């Protein structure tokens, strides 16, 4: 390939970068000549390539890249494939120009959402998805190749969806070969964007028109999918501090405006696309290098074993895995998911000391080359050697030697999220598996907008010879996320002590873009009060310009952003620079700085500057400056508390500003001034036997498109015992959306105190009488806002319609009677509250409204676990009932649409997250619905949907019982149980076939034979052509009769219709068998059933 001479020097004497000549068709420029590897290795530090209609300058040198990362001369250009992605993700943070007001506003709103505290709080959701992947691998066994890129894409897509918008794609529950449509569309649009960026528009529009049509169609599909998520959240709001809620509700701190819906869509798509593809690439290449470098793999595993052992990985573990972080850094150095980025000059400029570039000229920095600079990384720069990325060596890297997360203000704000997810994923994989390399694999690269290895597979073997079930148990052993709680007993005698006898106060000042400093300010305020200090004020830095307090010590907590102050500290720093010597005398101060080592050149620059300016101009430093590196080996909160304990508080104590306060290295010994007694909430105290359990996990078990099935894991109160087959009563709460609707309707504040008196106390059981209670708590926890309105309720409401609205009264009266009531109210679960919202002309008092409601009653759910499965814990399996469908209220209401109500309890359960409390009480099963663990009695279990719950508990207990017996007998396997069948009906194998892996393990152990029926996919394997479970029973009639004659017990769990259909099949069969065996003389099946022995045919019917 020939290279032209540099162009003639400009008037300033500097040539443009040399341009690669086309070797084939000049009108196509270098399109047919592009070979990324050859370009980066053979054409020098700076050159230019021609795409026919435009040219790009290419830079491969670290030194020149350092120039281009100077944001006073150059800014990011969303060029190339990124520019083409605007059709998909609009003006998101990835694609919009920095000076675009939409980018600036979105950045101000979104950047604080990625502070360390929020990211740390996402750990449970990240672990949830990672556990799904690991359990899937364990159940595949060591003989099945794992397609690494596919698995990592599932992991990262599901994680970012769950953490940011509380949505589950459930990718790991899809059959192999059936890709999540969203993920498939993402890969397609990214691939086509890259192709488009390398071709002239006339080729894209005229030659590639079919590809462009597909690209545009999939872009619309992706945007529509995000729009649906947003609409769903608005219709079904959740009290969750996630990215979606924040983007919909937070205001731009400068303009006071919220983000438009279009910008919310743009940025959510940006996170989904840019976030999951890049992290998937990082994890895929990390697996490749670990497989290629056994010594690195062994060292990384040893670190995980020493730090975590076999316990559940917690947030505090991640900062104690420095070698694993070095492995990921080295992976990013060699295989940056995004091979570079574009910048443009802010004005005509000269780069590399000699090349002229015009204003707005697109310049591409190839970081694949910059990251392999031998002057920085040595002659072995192309080799994978994590030791070169140890913290000590990493801190010594020259500027711009490592930029996988971009530069400056346009650096990736999701970096902490990606690194936490990546460290967690690799640590969990190494903790639980031995990795088996495919010796025949040779690295091949696939380039879209990111880079990933093609065809990479490995096999995995659970470590230490564990079986898949053992891996599952190990993942959920004592984790520290929750501990068994004592049963509440009115008052537990606990004391909270706070002293306020210190005469001094603190002024706390914070400044950061991400909100981290603000969180630390709140922590300091709490700790200061605990130690006897008052807090005079908590302010942002810009608010104390020329107002630095002199009467109290000032603690300033701040961060740097590429060497510059945060937005809310810029004025403060500017003012400090203008102060003169002695001007700040009398000010006593301490500074704490936050930063991240990946920006080593500007680490703690602003905190150091503030500390220096204060001291130089007369202020007194009361404690040495503290710092915390959020990329370091400890977490920021520990660093901060260590600093306050060792330096700040001891100084204050020595100056007698914390009188009568004992420090004792942060010990919790304090003078008693305030006594706080803890007791049960009134709604719990009114019901005997209820105590608090703690949620440890809440996971979805079904795919989109069917009513959601979920499993809730609870840490039970201490002393709580149950049997497999028992039920758990729970106290639900109304949705925050319904509570807010009531408050708005009656013009109440959430904190308004309401007192209820009644002359007929016995009619108001369940309501708090004669005691003040906050309105928000009354409507959340005491009355059922979603209960279907009775015909009488509607008649009462009709009588309260304003006299000048006769039409509304007629509508209500028509709804209260006959078929209209059944079809338009009862079937659609329309509540009194729904009617008040729909018809504001109903004039009802608060007392009248309460009189129409029923107290909230407990709901019962079957345990889906056995008591010995995980002592102290239990699971419930439930269906989220019927929320979300739009229904027409009635013809006579002019087809006004109303949302069908979901079930109160199931909707409430679906909102719970780890560490939430739930009040529970034991509800024993019928004596006939227990498995007596008889080894000689056959069992026939029949279930539909979540009716499978008690049978999972039965099988768990049987498995553990066999294992215990084998242990006592000194053999590997105990004798088998009698034949056990499970007939299970659901919609389809890829939709809601619950506990597939668990049941497969039970079958492999010889504990059960599973027979399925799929109502939406009766041709699927395993259904024997049956849509419903009664059909499957009829197909097995002969063997069922044989088992009945052997004394089999039958257990049925499901809805009333299903149970009736089951008996319609089995009743005549078993009745006839008993007649033939002369065990009954009854000719009537119904009468025969009443003569059966206890537990011979037992039913649990859903109500």
UniProtKB/Swiss-Prot annotation:
Residues 484-1103 are annotated as: NADPH-P-450 reductase. The record marks 278 as: Important for catalytic activity. Heme binds at residue 412. It comes from the Eukaryota. GO terms for molecular function: aromatase activity; flavin adenine dinucleotide binding; FMN binding; heme binding; iron ion binding; NADPH-hemoprotein reductase activity. CDD domains: bifunctional_CYPOR (cd06206), CYP120A1 (cd11068). FMN binds at residues 512-516, 560-563, 591-623. Residues 16-483 are annotated as: Cytochrome P450. It holds the Pfam family NAD_binding_1. Residues 688-932 form the FAD-binding FR-type domain. It catalyses: an organic molecule + reduced [NADPH--hemoprotein reductase] + O2 = an alcohol + oxidized [NADPH--hemoprotein reductase] + H2O + H(+); 2 oxidized [cytochrome P450] + NADPH = 2 reduced [cytochrome P450] + NADP(+) + H(+). Its cofactor is FAD; FMN; heme. GO terms for cellular component: cytosol. Pathway: Mycotoxin biosynthesis. SUPFAM superfamilies: Cytochrome P450 (SSF48264), Ferredoxin reductase-like, C-terminal NADP-linked domain (SSF52343), Flavoproteins (SSF52218), Riboflavin synthase domain-like (SSF63380). InterPro entries: Bifunctional_P450_P450_red, CysJ-like_FAD-binding, Cyt_P450, Cyt_P450_CS, Cyt_P450_E_grp-I, Cyt_P450_sf, FAD-bd_FR_type, Flavodoxin/NO_synth. The keyword Kinase does not apply. Residues 506-648 form the Flavodoxin-like domain. The keyword Oxidoreductase applies. Keywords: Electron transport, FAD, Flavoprotein, FMN, Heme, Iron, Metal-binding, Monooxygenase, Multifunctional enzyme, NADP, Oxidoreductase, Transport. Its EC number is 1.14.14.1, 1.6.2.4. Binds 1 FAD. Bifunctional cytochrome P450/NADPH--P450 reductase; part of the gene cluster that mediates the biosynthesis of the host-selective toxins (HSTs) AAL-toxins, sphinganine-analog mycotoxins responsible for Alternaria stem canker on tomato by the tomato pathotype. ALT1 also selectively transfers methyl groups at the first and the third cycle of chain elongation for AAL toxin. Gene clusters encoding host-selective toxins (HSTs) are localized on conditionally dispensable chromosomes (CDCs), also called supernumerary chromosomes, where they are present in multiple copies. The CDCs are not essential for saprophytic growth but controls host-selective pathogenicity. In the N-terminal section; belongs to the cytochrome P450 family. This is Bifunctional cytochrome P450/NADPH--P450 reductase ALT2. The gene is ALT2.
């Amino acid at each position: 390939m020939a290279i032209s001479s540099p162009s003639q020097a400009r008037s300033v004497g500097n040539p443009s970068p040399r341009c690669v000549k086309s070797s084939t068709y000049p009108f196509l420029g270098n399109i047919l000549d592009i070979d990324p590897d050859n370009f980066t290795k053979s054409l020098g530090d700076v050159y230019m390539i021609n795409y026919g209609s435009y040219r790009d300058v290419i830079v491969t040198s670290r030194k020149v890249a350092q120039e281009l990362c100077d944001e006073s001369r150059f800014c990011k250009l969303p060029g190339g494939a990124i520019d083409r992605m605007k059709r998909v993700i609009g003006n998101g943070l990835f694609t919009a120009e920095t000076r675009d007001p939409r980018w600036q506003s979105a950045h101000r709103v979104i950047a604080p959402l990625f502070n360390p505290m929020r990211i740390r709080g996402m750990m449970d959701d990240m672990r949830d998805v990672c556990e799904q992947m690991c359990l899937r691998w364990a159940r595949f066994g060591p003989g099945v190749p794992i397609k690494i890129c596919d698995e990592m894409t599932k992991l990262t897509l599901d994680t970012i969806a769950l953490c940011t918008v509380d949505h589950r794609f459930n990718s790991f529950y899809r059959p192999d070969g059936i890709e999540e449509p969203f993920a498939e569309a993402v890969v397609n649009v990214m691939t086509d964007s890259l192709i488009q960026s390398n071709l002239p528009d006339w080729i894209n529009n005229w030659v590639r028109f079919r590809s462009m049509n597909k690209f545009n169609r999939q872009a619309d599909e992706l945007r529509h999918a995000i729009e649906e998520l947003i609409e769903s959240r608005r219709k079904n709001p959740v009290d969750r501090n996630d990215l979606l809620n924040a983007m919909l509700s937070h205001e731009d701190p400068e303009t006071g405006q919220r983000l438009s819906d279009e910008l919310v869509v743009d940025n959510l798509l940006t996170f989904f696309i840019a976030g999951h593809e890049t992290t998937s690439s990082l994890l895929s290449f990390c697996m490749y290098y670990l497989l290629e470098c056994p010594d690195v793999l062994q060292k990384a595993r040893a670190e995980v074993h020493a730090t975590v052992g076999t316990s559940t990985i917690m947030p505090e573990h991640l900062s104690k895995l420095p070698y694993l972080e070095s492995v990921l850094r080295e992976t990013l150095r060699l295989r940056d998911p995004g091979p570079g980025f574009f910048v443009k000059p802010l004005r005509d400029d000269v780069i590399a000391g000699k090349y002229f570039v015009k204003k707005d000229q697109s310049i591409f920095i190839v970081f694949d080359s910059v990251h392999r600079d031998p002057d920085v990384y040595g002659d072995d720069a192309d080799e994978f050697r994590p030791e070169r990325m140890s913290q000590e060596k990493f801190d010594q890297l020259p500027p711009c030697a490592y930029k996988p997360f971009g530069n400056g203000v346009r650096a990736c704000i999701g970096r902490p999220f990606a690194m936490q997810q990546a460290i967690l994923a690799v640590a969990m994989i190494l903790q639980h598996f031995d990795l088996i390399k495919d010796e025949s694999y040779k690295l091949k690269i696939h380039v879209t907008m990111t880079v990933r290895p093609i065809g990479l597979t490995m096999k995995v073997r659970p470590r230490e010879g564990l079986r898949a079930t053992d891996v599952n148990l190990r993942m959920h052993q004592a984790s520290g996320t929750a501990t068994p709680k004592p049963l509440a007993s009115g008052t537990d005698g606990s004391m909270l002590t706070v002293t306020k006898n210190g005469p001094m106060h603190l002024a706390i000042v914070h400044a950061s873009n991400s909100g981290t400093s603000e969180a630390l300010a709140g922590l300091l305020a709490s700790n200061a009060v605990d130690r006897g200090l008052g807090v005079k004020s908590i302010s942002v830095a810009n608010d104390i310009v020329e107002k630095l307090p002199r009467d109290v010590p000032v603690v300033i907590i701040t961060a740097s952003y590429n060497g510059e102050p945060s937005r809310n500290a810029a004025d403060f720093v500017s003012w400090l620079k203008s102060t003169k010597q002695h001007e700040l005398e009398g000010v006593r101060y301490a500074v704490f700085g936050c930063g991240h080592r990946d920006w080593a050149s500007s680490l703690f620059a602003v905190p150091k500057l503030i500390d220096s300016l204060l001291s130089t101009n007369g202020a007194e430093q009361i404690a040495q400056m503290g710092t915390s590196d959020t990329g370091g080996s400890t977490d920021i909160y520990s660093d901060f508390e260590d600093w306050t304990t060792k330096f700040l508080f001891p100084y204050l104590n020595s100056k007698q500003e914390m009188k009568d306060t004992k420090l004792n290295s942060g010990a919790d010994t304090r003078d008693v001034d305030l006594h706080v007694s803890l007791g049960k909430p009134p709604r719990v105290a009114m019901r005997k036997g209820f105590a608090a359990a703690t949620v440890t996990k809440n996971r979805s078990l079904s795919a989109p498109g069917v009513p959601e099935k979920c499993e809730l894991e609870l840490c039970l109160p201490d002393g709580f015992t149950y049997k497999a087959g028992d039920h758990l009563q729970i106290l639900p709460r109304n949705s925050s959306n319904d509570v807010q609707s009531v408050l708005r309707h009656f013009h109440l504040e959430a904190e308004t105190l309401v007192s209820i008196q009644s002359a007929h106390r016995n009619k108001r059981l369940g309501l708090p009488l004669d005691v003040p209670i906050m309105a928000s708590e009354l409507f959340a926890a005491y009355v059922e806002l979603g209960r279907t309105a009775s015909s009488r309720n509607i008649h009462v409401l009709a009588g309260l319609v304003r006299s000048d609205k006769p039409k509304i009264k007629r509508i209500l009266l028509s709804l209260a009677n006959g078929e209209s009531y059944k079809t338009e109210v009862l079937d659609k679960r329309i509540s009194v509250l729904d009617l008040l919202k729909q018809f504001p002309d109903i004039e009802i008092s608060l007392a009248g409204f309460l009189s129409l409601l029923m107290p909230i009653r407990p709901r019962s759910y079957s345990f889906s676990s056995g008591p010995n499965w995980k002592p102290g814990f239990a699971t419930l399996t439930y269906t989220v009932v019927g929320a979300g469908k739009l229904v027409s209220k009635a013809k006579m209401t002019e087809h006004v649409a109303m949302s069908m109500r979901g079930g109160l309890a199931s909707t409430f359960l679906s909102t719970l997250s780890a560490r939430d409390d739930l009040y529970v009480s034991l509800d024993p099963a019928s004596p006939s619905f227990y498995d007596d663990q008889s080894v000689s009695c056959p069992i026939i279990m029949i279930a539909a949907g979540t009716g499978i719950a008690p049978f999972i508990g039965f099988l768990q207990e049987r498995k553990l019982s066999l294992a215990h017996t084998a242990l006592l007998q000194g053999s590997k396997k105990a004798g088998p149980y009698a034949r056990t069948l499970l007939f299970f009906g659901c919609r389809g194998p890829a939709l809601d076939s619950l506990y597939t892996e668990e049941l497969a393990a039970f079958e492999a152990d010889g504990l059960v034979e599973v027979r399925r029926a799929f109502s939406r996919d009766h041709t699927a394997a395993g259904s024997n052509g049956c849509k419903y479970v009664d059909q499957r029973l009829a197909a097995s009639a002969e063997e069922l009769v044989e088992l009945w004659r052997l004394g089999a017990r039958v257990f049925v769990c499901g809805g009333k219709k299903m149970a009736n259909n089951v008996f319609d099949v089995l009743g005549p069969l078993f009745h006839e068998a008993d007649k033939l065996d002369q065990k009954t003389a009854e000719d009537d099946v119904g009468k025969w059933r009443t003569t059966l022995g206890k537990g011979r045919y037992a039913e649990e019917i859903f109500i």
